[in-house]
């Protein structure tokens, strides 16, 4: 699960046999402590055997002897040979002399691996060292006929020809270059811009290339390697190394490389150091010296060495000085000492513990700090005791040493207990730090038993398991998926974090004072001094002693105080220890067990059961642990949801044609798109048509049905009213005339009895004979009314909802078009040029990157409160010194320690003073756990396009800015700018744990306590730290020496708890957010204008292409709103065989094919996508056109897992069947109205004619 295996893993559980085992004889149990000691002895022997095997030189003579030894043998003659042979024989028979063996032993070089051997072979003639003062300061290499050397590397190239070349400087790339002579060009490297992710080779082994960055394991490569090349498997140079920076367990390299166009590109990580071999100088007594070669070391002059380290504590070469001071020159180096041996400069101490077995006490195992910020369940403690050292200060694994009233004692680490709610498993310890794995609890206790006395110390601290990912599990799973996390390193490597040390102050030790008879005796420990202060009968005594001395003036132990003095050991700068008088010599040592990037196994929640509906998705969830469900719409408004689900639940969501995404726990995101489908049949009966359109367009369908119902109702009502009025108008004259006969037609129409009157034919005959113009007008009135009503109904109701787009074609070889900015959607078009055959163009964007220009404002992380040991002055006053550290607070407290009581044991009562100082610094794990605040500016867009022009194809990267062209085969392509200047990033963004957040952070220097940005630094390693944490010092109690304070909680920790989901889950338009560099990919927004400049050579004359004499198009199958769900078959007769471009000038259909092969006679199958129910489009084949039309059916699947590659600006049209039913309905209503109008007209004509006749 974790990248660091525990030092002593627990044994696996034995297999359980389901059958009963036979009874075994009883044996007495062994003592568990004896078994532990045996195991410790076995481990020690195994480690010793392993080290001896590893350090043993290889057997037999060396493969090749040095030239110096060979020349000495020739000069020495036969006598020397005899002596050497005799010496060899004696060495075989007798045991070797250990002193001589150690003195003559040379460090055996490890045999280089295959990668190193290959690089060394290639470097031999093509890489040249740059010498400075007799040392290799860097390297120069010859690549592609040019000499490259880093500009920051001073010195002369170790080649007379190359050293004489006059170089040109490129300060932007930190390089100097020159053309090499012609006779040397055959031996130069070749370079390449191809850099697939994987491993490459250089002088020190393998180099990993990932996400545009070259990294090597930490410790591989150092100063002096600047200018070395990185090679691929074919021996081509992919990059030149300039420097590096440590990033946890790996080192990121600063390199110069080449892009696809052969242009030099430089990549430099933050806080990168140049790797020229520049000697760092340190200072001692106003004399400078190389930090790696100090004049003194700790084993010979410990006090002077600590003073030297204190003077150079802020020097950039402090680490080199510390390593050299610990390892004296000529001293034998053991592999265990190389791990972490600098803590021999320190000693353990006793400090106040707030909760021992019975209240507070002065404990040898006081707990200073506890941290458990990793995702692996481990806890790192800092205590007053030390680990890995014995009582004498020598390295000894699995051992704890502690201070017991001035005497340093040791105890095996397995006898130390650590527990929270249950016992913890101690992994290892180094210096003041202990690494353990503990169960959850609200406090942590450490204890051990020595000489029947149990020592313990407890501190309140909530220990809990911190899960990583989107599932809140409480224990690491056995199976799952690997995810990036932060774990505590199980080693003591230098990872850039320090803990502050200083010389211990004068500690009162009452055990040194005893009463012998009637006088006081002070006995200092062996090898140390003691400061004695007494006040006996008005006589004050103050002197330093290094052996036992009696003071006859004093008769009581309370009259004297004895202080232990030691200036050859450091202690941790704890607030529980008093500060030494005068200028305190400070230092710093490395902190082990820091957080590092690793891989953790996280659980996978059971897959949700998905049920698809019409534009909806139902998720049935069964989480084992509390699991987050995150959803968003892939449109302009994401409408994201973020819900923690702990119990089985069902959630329903709406899915649109633009897409919907959900993330369940630690599963990868899943996306779904809705299709233009619905129940019913758009080509069926009226109720099926209504059902279909009601589900697709509910509001429009309801509105249309309401209008139709209103028209029918009005029509029926109007017809009825007209009929009644006509009947009344017809019958009224006859009712008023006695014995009048009603004509037969009126009697039938008006349901009246017939009466004698002039008939219709008689009236028409009268008009024909007397007024023929009126006769024709009377006949044309009903026909005119019918025509007018029909036209009005068609204008009102028959609105065609189609959008027609112009085809993308250009009459010349300069062609401009626009394609959607959506990855994976192919865009096909043709170029029509007079006299030439159509030229097909196909463009498919495979990836679209939007990279903003960002500026790092500051870095913030969890803070650590540093406290100086309090300065205590008895019988006197003090003042605060000027403060210069971040958020530093200083305060003087008077009257803190009563007379001869309390932590200071002062002789005065109220004149005693204490100066308390506290300040803020970055936490030890800030390098691994921090957030970066950026300001984002104008974004650049890169499109990775697969372009086909005619029969020529290329995969290229285009900057979508409207200015940068791409050329291939004579075609010049310019893309952009984007139609929509849009970006998912706000002006202020925060990067944390590989994810990006839009967050309005405070400006640099304006942080508030308890909020994001309470501490700010320009970079992780810079010293310009700003802090505002509301740090307030409190008055100390007299019982113990300490520095109490209050402080606001960490704003960074609070932000981590309260932060919303990152842009990875909330960005609009389905953007995919990545880091290194910060970018958004595949945002489906806007369109990309394209301009083509096509040479004449790519066009084909019309005479050389086929011509269709007859063509007929039939739609075999058609599913609208589906991914190329239409199949068209074109039967044709061509003039000759050949290849023709196909295209649809309108936007009704999108073709899958850009060209088809034609024979003299046959058929061609073409796939297309459309959003119309009744598509009708003109298909261009070469220079001929053929019309395709037919009916399309809705898709069967409601939800699909990929977007639809058709023109999504179209919506499905109303089917012809629906229009037929609609016009029939409206036509029926119109017939009633027309009949009523005709009747009214006939009646009016008849009445008027009859009145005129009478």
Swiss-Prot record:
Where are the disulfide bridges? Answer: 861-926, 874-906, 875-908, 880-890, 1071-1083, 1113-1188, 1118-1192, 1140-1182
- Region called Binding to the viral RNA, residue ranges: 91-127
* Cellular component aspect of the GO annotation: host cell cytoplasm; host cell nucleus; host cell plasma membrane; membrane; T=4 icosahedral viral capsid; viral envelope; virion membrane
Sorted alphabetically, the keyword list is:
Capsid protein, Clathrin-mediated endocytosis of virus by host, Cleavage on pair of basic residues, Disulfide bond, Eukaryotic host gene expression shutoff by virus, Eukaryotic host transcription shutoff by virus, Fusion of virus membrane with host endosomal membrane, Fusion of virus membrane with host membrane, Glycoprotein, Host cell membrane, Host cytoplasm, Host gene expression shutoff by virus, Host membrane, Host nucleus, Host-virus interaction, Hydrolase, Lipoprotein, Membrane, Palmitate, Phosphoprotein, Protease, RNA-binding, Serine protease, T=4 icosahedral capsid protein, Transmembrane, Transmembrane helix, Viral attachment to host cell, Viral attachment to host entry receptor, Viral envelope protein, Viral penetration into host cytoplasm, Virion, Virus endocytosis by host, Virus entry into host cell
Q: Phosphothreonine: which positions carry it?
A: 93, 108, 127
Q: Segment E1 fusion peptide loop: which positions?
A: 896-913
* Glycan attachment sites: 286, 546, 652, 946
Record site: Cleavage: 275-276, 334-335, 757-758, 812-813
| Protein name (Swiss-Prot/TrEMBL) | Structural polyprotein
Q: Which organism is it from?
A: Venezuelan equine encephalitis virus (strain TC-83) (VEEV)
